[in-house]
UniProtKB/Swiss-Prot annotation:
Catalyzes the specific attachment of an amino acid to its cognate tRNA in a two step reaction: the amino acid (AA) is first activated by ATP to form AA-AMP and then transferred to the acceptor end of the tRNA. The lineage of its organism: Eukaryota, Viridiplantae, Streptophyta, Embryophyta, Tracheophyta. Keywords: Aminoacyl-tRNA synthetase, ATP-binding, Cytoplasm, Ligase, Nucleotide-binding, Protein biosynthesis. Pfam families: Anticodon_1, RBD_LARS1, tRNA-synt_1. Its main location: cytoplasm. A motif ('KMSKS' region) lies at residues 715-719. This is Leucine--tRNA ligase, cytoplasmic. It is found in: Cytoplasm, Cytosol. Gene3D superfamilies: HUPs, Valyl/Leucyl/Isoleucyl-tRNA synthetase, editing domain. One of its GO terms (biological process) is leucyl-tRNA aminoacylation.
Length: 1091
């Protein structure tokens, strides 16, 4: 293997095969999808899609992982005989391309063309290290060796777009062209098509298109969709708090973000705590104005209990001009958010009058709304986070554990007071009870801190637990003890108090991102109060319809369903308009563009007719018989919404009928596959829009979500070099190795792992399999013929039937790792076991050919290039394997499967017994057990079988037989059966602990077996004859154990036992039981001859 490990020959052979097969597919146009006049019956067609990717770079393995799921599913249905449509489009809407192009333009203006960056301007990205492999060492083409990458750019650091473009392999002269956004649209989509063709995507490329107004047909489609939603009252203009990019000057939706996808605005009540005059010297410039410490709180109802305010001593603050008369003291970050919410003298521009630190604020006397204390003071708190809220915190020690412990630290530690210049008279003298909470009383924070033995404000874990215990209960069960709402529930009066504070001018509404959000342009986002167009997701009646649709869909996992249900529970109005970027203009308000998650919720319908517009030209559709301006609302209504025939249209009636037929045939969408992160936006929008615009019969049928992909168990990141484009992966591992590895990476919604070791092993395994098939077929005349008759023949054929059924189920459930296990790994193991079992008799000709046929077809969805090559060139079959049909199979014989497992397990057991007897079992000797050592040499195996359970095992089986529910195929809880078993065995003097230790594993094993193969598993005998199975395979046992001879005997027959002679004692030491034979290994002279 040493020379082979340095060779690329195996990988190169797969690449050659793929090129050959790709040419066949192109010549035969195998993925062309045509509708029929008659509507399809269930199962006759399969229409699936993948969210079209952004075209601001090459496709990578992350794209390929999600895409592989829909590709495998489509290929499976194609193999089963369905008419399959899998289209693929390219998304260019929104900010990603525009932001990148603008970055290039700025870099050229600042640093020249090509730009000259200084050493300080750039940060080197570690080079990709070549992966090691025990099988094949392959080169890594196109290593990313540039500066900091796009992933690094997402962190918001100084990363140059020019260097990112260089990492794509572009020259400086080429890069300059990308300052124009249109260059991206024409450069990357054709490269993506190349990569996807090499990958083997089963796509009808006639239907491909790009978004934005560069494609006038799609532009017309989106305009119709938006007008339709507006006419239905589902698009409105409103002022709402929205995540906003100051640099871009517009809202920043999920797909416009580098980090923070899914983050929503968090609303606070901003309490205005007025600074009591006279002002200290530091605040002198603010004379003549009302100055407030502005504290953001989620609990306005607790303001009655304020004892002080908190500031961070080392924190940086500012006095910001909110209006002509009012000044707020808070952090710069909070001031910026307020400026975008119309709380700044200069809109969107915070005006700082005085820069301050927390030290400057300590000791300020304050009047705070609702507080029982007329004057409270600003005191130091060491755990305040200035990236959350305003940096000013209200203190309510009766109900906030953090406040209670910080106050205790100050009161009990004079040194801390001295350090920060805190005067004794500033410290509150008592805690004010304001809320009674069952379990915690009227000073919940004090009680929980004492209960948890919290020592200081720095005990973060215990304080977090204290908050968890008290906060929710305070809201749901708390009762007010003070003020005009005395005796009323907190959850009732909280919104009332909030409204009252705002109406009296003692507080305002303040909002900020609940977590940091970075735009793709590189700035940190704020929350802005914007006046723009919104889609009314979350509206009660619309939500009910969306929930109805969801309830009927196949979502393939409970986690996915829970994710959608949660999203539907909170999703509200969505800003659908943007001021900058690429896309379609809002038709009634053309100063705005349709944002990228709003033009991508219904385009699956566009795919059904896209080939009539484009026919391979993904841009303007130069070959089309239709002009874009002919696609008016009346035509779209007719095609997609059961509207009347558009009599005024000058589109030929035959073309209109063809488009209508295409949509009616392919819709509804059978499957959409995506990463789980799109549940919270795109996929839910997809459901909402279909339920609003489509008839019930055309609602989507299924969504399958997956997790993210890791490379070699590490997060995929170009900045660390742990990254692969799809093109790189194909060059490195071949398309076949890449696809195999993607299937093996994982099912479900958890993160999966693309392991290079697996891809390399796939290359080795598949090329070896190809060689084996060719070698077998070269000598097929020497293979055994006639009816398959041996035990090994029957087992092998049964294993193929089992693999067919399990693989079919896995593909149907979109469990592709499971399909690979059942349809490849397990099938390979069955073939290897068959080859070993056949011995001198040889393998059967027909069974081997059936195996090659079955193996080839089962791997079609995952490795189509390999499968089609084997089908045509190795097996000499007619036609293309992609549509060859699912292999026929017989009903699997589960008893035979169980018998073969018994045989294999018995051989393993016998091997252990042989090793034990040959060694004299030192372990057994130490324990004083009698062990007979056998001299080395030619040995004979005496295998003893007890075919019927007795004793406590028989008791267990009788109980299981009586308690098995055949309708539900289930048993009652173990505790019930153990009680029944104990009642019987305790009467016989058995110890209860001994019963549990010995019986429970046996009970569990037999329960599982019964659920798997039926009640026959509960018989006192196994569902097959053990002696018969072992007798039929004596030669296999002999060869596997290296024995001269093997005989099978019954342990219940005294004559058989006597044959063991002096070694019969071993049957007492290790008595056989059903499923567990005992073997004695002797020389031929040390046994008694049969009588």
């Amino acid at each position: 293997m040493a020379s082979e490990s340095k060779s690329y020959a195996r990988r190169d052979r797969l690449l050659e095969i793929e090129a050959t097969v790709r040419k066949w597919w192109e010549d035969e146009d195998v993925f062309r999808a045509e509708s029929c006049e008659n509507l399809p019956k269930p199962g006759e067609k399969f229409f699936s899609t993948f969210p079209f990717p952004y075209m601001n770079g090459y496709l990578h393995i992350g794209h390929a992982f999600s895409l592989s799921k829909v590709d495998f599913a489509s290929a499976y249905h194609r193999l089963r005989g369905a008419n399959v449509l899998l289209p693929f489009g390219f998304h260019c809407t929104g900010m990603p391309i525009k932001a990148s192009a603008d970055k290039l333009r700025r870099e050229i203006e600042q640093f020249g063309n090509p730009p000259v960056f200084t050493a300080e301007d750039t940060t080197k990205v570690p080079e990709v290290q070549e992966e090691s492999s025990d099988t094949i060492a392959l080169p890594i083409p196109g290593q990313f060796k540039g500066k900091k990458s796009k992933v690094a750019a997402k962190a918001g650091g100084q990363v140059y777009q020019w260097e990112i473009m260089r990492s794509f392999g572009l020259t400086d002269s080429e890069i300059a062209n990308f300052r124009e956004p249109s260059e991206w649209l024409y450069y990357f989509p054709p490269l993506a098509v190349e990569d996807l063709r090499a990958y083997g995507l089963g796509c009808d490329w006639r239907r491909s298109f790009v978004t934005t107004d560069v494609n006038p047909f799609f532009d017309a489609f989106v305009r119709w969709q938006m007008r339709k939603l507006k006419s239905m009252g589902k698009i409105v203009k409103d002022r709402r708090y929205t995540i906003f990019s100051p640099l871009d000057g517009q809202p920043c939706a999920d797909h416009d973000r580098a980090t923070g996808e899914g983050v929503q605005p968090q609303e606070y009540t901003l309490i205005k705590m007025e600074v009591v005059k006279p002002f200290p010297l530091k605040l002198g410039p603010l004379e003549g104005k009302r100055v407030f410490l502005a504290a953001a709180t989620l609990r306005p109802e607790t303001m009655y209990g304020q004892t002080n305010a908190w500031v961070l001593p080392d924190g940086k603050y500012g006095a910001y001009e909110i209006s002509e008369t009012e000044v707020f003291i808070l952090t710069e970050r909070a001031a910026l958010n307020l400026a975008y919410q119309n709380f700044s003298k200069n809109p969107q521009e915070p005006s700082c009058l005085v820069e301050l630190t927390g030290y400057d604020l300590i000791g300020l006397p304050l009047r705070s709304p609702l507080s029982v204390n007329e004057i409270i003071y600003a005191l130091p708190m060491l755990t305040i986070l200035t990236n959350k809220g305003t940096g000013i915190v209200t203190s309510v020690p009766s109900d906030a554990p953090d406040d209670y412990m910080a106050l205790q630290d100050l009161i009990k530690k004079p040194a801390l007071q001295d350090k920060y210049g805190v005067k004794t008279e500033w410290l509150p003298t008592e805690i004010i009870p304001i809320i009674n909470i069952p379990e915690f009383g009227d000073k919940a924070a004090e009680k929980v801190c004492l209960d948890l033995k919290i020592k200081s404000q720095n005990d973060k874990e215990k304080l977090a637990e204290a908050k968890r215990l008290t906060y929710l209960k305070g809201f749901t069960e708390g009762t007010m003890l003070i003020g005009e709402f005395f005796g009323r529930k907190v959850q009732e009066i909280k919104p009332i108090i909030k409204t009252k504070l705002i109406e009296t001018g003692e507080a305002i509404i303040y909002s900020e991102p609940e977590k940091p959000v970075m735009s793709r342009s590189g700035d940190e986002c704020v929350v802005a109060l914007t006046d723009q167009w919104y889609i009314t997701y979350g509206e009660s009646e619309w939500r009910k319809i969306a929930e109805e649709c969801l309830s009927k869909m196949n979502l393939y996992s409970d986690e996915t369903r829970h994710g959608f249900e949660h999203t539907l529970s909170w999703l509200n109005q969505w800003a659908c308009s943007r001021s900058f970027g690429l896309g379609t203009r809002i038709p009634w308000d053309e100063q705005f563009l349709v944002e990228s998650l709003s033009d991508s919720s219904l385009y699956m319908a566009y795919y059904t007719v896209a080939h009539i517009f484009h026919d391979g030209d993904m841009y303007k559709g130069s070959k089309s018989l239709i002009r874009p301006q002919q696609m008016n609302d009346e035509v779209w209504e007719y095609l997609f919404c059961d509207g009347p025939y558009p009599k005024s249209s000058d589109i030929p009636s035959a073309v209109l009928s063809e488009m209508k037929q295409e949509f009616d045939y392919w819709y509804p969408l059978d499957l959409r596959v995506s990463g789980k992160d799109l549940i919270q936006n795109h996929l839910t929008f997809f459901i909402y829009n279909h339920t609003a615009l489509m008839a019930n019969r055309n609602w989507p049928r299924g969504i399958r979500c997956n997790g993210h992909i890791m490379l070699n168990s590490e997060k995929m990141s170009k900045s660390t070099g742990n990254f692969r484009t799809l093109r790189q992966s194909i060059e490195e591992f071949s398309a076949t190795g890449t696809r195999f590895c993607l299937a093996d990476a994982g099912d479900g919604v958890d993160d999966a792992n693309f392991a290079f070791e697996t891809a390399n092993a796939a290359i080795l395994r598949l090329t070896k399999e190809l060689t084996w098939m060719e070698e077998v077929l070269d000598v097929e005349s020497s293979l055994r013929t006639g009816p398959p008759s041996t035990y090994a023949d029957k087992v092998f054929e049964n294993d193929m039937n089992i693999a067919l059924r399990l693989t079919e189920r896995a593909y149907k459930d979109c469990l592709f790792r499971e399909a690979l296990k059942n349809g490849f790994y397990d099938l390979q193991a069955a073939r290897d076991e068959y080859r070993l079992s056949c011995g001198t008799g040889g393998m059967h000709h027909d069974l081997l050919l059936k195996f090659m046929d079955v193996q080839t077809r089962l791997i079609v969805p995952i490795c189509p290039h390999f499968a089609d090559y084997v089908w045509r060139k190795v097996l000499n079959k007619e036609g293309c394997v992609l549509t060859a049909g699912w292999p026929p199979s017989n009903e699997p014989d589960l008893v035979l499967k169980s018998a073969n497992k018994y045989l294999q397990d018995s051989i393993v057991l016998m091997r252990k017994l042989l090793q034990k007897q040959l060694s004299g079992s030192k372990k057994g000797a130490k324990k004083g057990a009698q062990v007979t050592a056998v001299p080395e040499g030619k040995l004979k195996g005496l295998v003893y079988v007890n075919e019927q359970f007795d004793g406590w095992r028989a008791h267990c089986l009788r109980i299981l037989q009586s308690r098995f529910d055949q309708q539900t195929c289930s048993f009652p809880p173990d505790t019930e059966m153990l009680a029944e078993l104990s009642a019987t065995l305790l009467q016989e003097g058995k110890n209860l602990k001994a019963i549990q230790k010995v019986c429970m594993p046996f009970l569990k094993f037999k329960k599982d077996e019964a659920i798997s193969i039926g009640t026959q598993a509960l018989n006192l005998r196994l569902p097959f004859g053990e002696i018969e199975v072992l007798q039929s395979n004596k030669d296999l046992i002999r060869r596997q154990l290296g024995l001269e001879e093997v005989e099978i005997y019954s342990a219940s027959d005294p004559d058989d036992v006597s044959i063991a002679g002096p070694h019969a004692s071993l049957l007492t030491q290790n008595p056989p039981s059903p499923g567990s034979p005992t073997a004695i290994f002797v020389t031929s002279t040390s046994v008694c001859p049969p009588s």
